[in-house]
């Protein structure tokens, strides 16, 4: 394995082309070993592209978590709203059931009252028939008595 030193005071100065080639070779050797230089020329274990992608992924994850938090708040609000509407619907349902039962009760009361009135009408009709029969009987008695009186007066 070849070891290169970027700063070697013993060597004589190299031409810029050759120095660039040696620097590139050194970077390639370090890259093969899993070491890389970043934009500030600091030695890193991760490839700068991978590092940048990691940072971007971390930011995207943070944004995603923030959006999930907002989504959960919105969903929580919707759930509360739906629960409130369900309670109101249940209350209205109970009111409707109560009103229906009240109407049934009123209908039954009216039916009972109607039956009572019909029974009273039937009773009054029977009483009227008795009075009519009694009246006819009294009219007959009156006619007989008037006839008797007339006969009595004419006989004298």
Swiss-Prot record:
UniProt-listed Pfam families: IFT20
Any one GO molecular-function label of the UniProt entry: small GTPase binding
Keywords noted in UniProt: Cell projection, Cilium, Cilium biogenesis/degradation, Coiled coil, Cytoplasm, Cytoplasmic vesicle, Cytoskeleton, Differentiation, Golgi apparatus, Spermatogenesis
Subcellular location: Golgi apparatus, cis-Golgi network; Cytoplasm, Cytoskeleton, Microtubule organizing center, Centrosome, Centriole; Cytoplasm, Cytoskeleton, Cilium basal body; Cell projection, Cilium
Region called IFT57-binding, residue ranges: 94-156
InterPro entries noted in UniProt: FT20 (IPR028172)
Coiled coil (UniProt feature): 98-138
Keyword Oxidoreductase: no
Biological process annotations from GO: cardiac muscle cell differentiation; centrosome localization; cilium assembly; cochlea development; establishment of epithelial cell apical/basal polarity; establishment of planar polarity; inner ear receptor cell stereocilium organization; intraciliary transport
Presence of the UniProt keyword Cytoplasm in the record: yes
Reported tissue expression: Expressed in retina and are more abundant in the inner segment of photoreceptors.
GO cellular component entries: acrosomal vesicle; centriole; centrosome; ciliary basal body; ciliary base; cilium; cis-Golgi network; cytoplasm
Disulfide bridge positions per record: none
Function recorded in the entry: Part of intraflagellar transport (IFT) particles involved in ciliary process assembly. May play a role in the trafficking of ciliary membrane proteins from the Golgi complex to the cilium. Regulates the platelet-derived growth factor receptor-alpha (PDGFRA) signaling pathway. Required for protein stability of E3 ubiquitin ligases CBL and CBLB that mediate ubiquitination and internalization of PDGFRA for proper feedback inhibition of PDGFRA signaling. Essential for male fertility. Plays an important role in spermatogenesis, particularly spermiogenesis, when germ cells form flagella.
Subunit and interaction comment: Component of the IFT complex B, at least composed of IFT20, IFT22, IFT25, IFT27, IFT46, IFT52, TRAF3IP1/IFT54, IFT57, IFT74, IFT80, IFT81, and IFT88. Interacts directly with IFT57 and KIF3B/Kinesin II subunit. Interacts with IFT88. Interacts with CEP83. Interacts with SPEF2 (via C-terminus). Interacts with CBL and CBLB. Interacts with TRIP11. Interacts with TTC21A. Interacts with SPATA1. Interacts with USH1G. Interacts with CCDC146. Interacts with CEP78; regulating IFT20 stability and localization.
Protein name: Intraflagellar transport protein 20 homolog
Origin organism lineage: Eukaryota, Metazoa, Chordata, Craniata, Vertebrata
Gene behind this protein: IFT20
């Amino acid at each position: 394995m070849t070891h290169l030193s970027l700063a070697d005071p013993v060597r004589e100065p190299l031409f810029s082309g050759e120095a660039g080639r040696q620097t590139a070779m050194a970077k390639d050797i370090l890259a093969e070993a899993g070491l890389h230089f970043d934009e500030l020329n600091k030695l890193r274990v991760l490839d700068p592209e991978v590092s940048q992608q990691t940072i971007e992924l971390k930011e995207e994850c943070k944004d995603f978590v923030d959006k999930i938090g907002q989504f959960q708040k919105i969903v929580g609000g919707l759930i509360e709203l739906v629960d409130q509407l369900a309670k109101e619907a249940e209350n209205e349902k109970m009111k409707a059931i109560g009103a229906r039962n009240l109407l049934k009760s009123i209908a039954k009361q009216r039916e009972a009252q109607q039956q009572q009135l019909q029974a009273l009408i039937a009773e009054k009709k029977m009483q009227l028939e008795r009075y009519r029969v009694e009246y006819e009987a009294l009219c007959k008695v009156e006619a007989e008595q008037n006839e008797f009186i007339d006969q009595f007066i004419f006989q004298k």
